[in-house]
Amino acid sequence: MRYITAGESHGPQLTTIIEGVPAGLSLVADDINEELARRQKGYGRGRRMQIETDQVQILSGVRHGETLGSPIALVVENRDFAHWTKIMGAEPLTEQEEKEMKRKVTKPRPGHADLNGAIKYGHRDMRNVLERSSARETTVRVAAGAVAKKVLAELGIKVAGHVIEIGGVQAKEITYSSIEELKSITEASPVRCLDDEAGNQMMKAIDDAKANGDSIGGIVEVIVEGMPIGVGSYVHYDRKLDAKLAAAIMSINAFKGVEIGIGFEAAHRPGSEVHDEILWNEEHGYTRRTNNAGGLEGGMTTGMPIVVRGVMKPIPTLYKPLQSVDIDTKEPFTASIERSDSCAVPAASVVAEAVVAWELATALIEQFGLDRMELIRENIEKHNEYARGF
């Protein structure tokens, strides 16, 4: 599977075209809208989320609630475009209209793509950069991820994300009996955190940052249960599943780090306390005593839950902006302010779920069949039976 997205933050709509989704997948707009609504929630979101009520239109590739195997086109309207029709319109402006246009951006914001993108593409108005580099684009990435989640769900694979740190407030490790329980707890939390006490402290940290005109980041974790053993490859570097997952997490706006399993903690432990001992029983076949590897070894799944974490930096759009330089006058200035969140970590956990789900669904389809869900399901069942008795 693959997809491409198009659209600007304040343009008329966001679009994604998805290719390679097998035929026979049950899919309706509400499957996607549910994920879009989850992305819009979360303590610390800005005023933009009060304007947009994201709803998807499925334009192709689905008929009567079932995928056809042909490309799927999804569109999400930007309601805020009504206030930006002249500024973000596709048609040329008159000389007078250009003079009257007030939202030209010549002051790059530290931490954003503004300056680098303007230099790369030769844009004197950096709105041409910030409109596309905006995290608003993750709307349709979540839409694509919702399709991937449906693929996984029909194959018995469950995905959940949650927040484990915001602004230096760390959640305690909370035990849960199932992915369903994890989901029910996090969906009820304004910051998508399992630890209620830490969640309250996180909200206070967000409030404090907002009051100071600042922003804060954090860490999200995605857990996936039900993946078969041996998905991915050790044969070539670019087929390693852990490498693909790491790239997917790092592709999310403002993410600056990723780890799988115990991650960087492995540097502090001896090998005897890192590697997961292998067990076998007649009912389940091969399993592990621990899961320090986070469900991945040698670029392939081990059959244990996949555990991936990502670090999100504080959003660089601040209400007490940092110093910058005007690209026209070269004079020092405080950076332009765009409407923004004070913390988007809870929403980012939903985006992280989406990109992880996409990579796993893609890997399964490549390995177990391309054309129809029935074939993929049968092949996975045969593979699991083979692996248990290996």
From Swiss-Prot:
Keywords: Amino-acid biosynthesis, Aromatic amino acid biosynthesis, FAD, Flavoprotein, FMN, Lyase, NADP. Pathway: Metabolic intermediate biosynthesis; chorismate biosynthesis; chorismate from D-erythrose 4-phosphate and phosphoenolpyruvate: step 7/7. GO terms for biological process: amino acid biosynthetic process; aromatic amino acid family biosynthetic process; chorismate biosynthetic process. Its cofactor is FMNH2. NADP(+) binds at residues 39, 45. GO terms for cellular component: cytosol. The keyword Flavoprotein applies. It comes from the Bacteria. Residues 95-117 are annotated as: Disordered. FMN binds at residues 132-134, 253-254, 298, 313-317, 339. GO terms for molecular function: chorismate synthase activity; FMN binding. It catalyses: 5-O-(1-carboxyvinyl)-3-phosphoshikimate = chorismate + phosphate. CDD domains: Chorismate_synthase. Belongs to the chorismate synthase family. This reaction introduces a second double bond into the aromatic ring system. Homotetramer. This is Chorismate synthase 1.
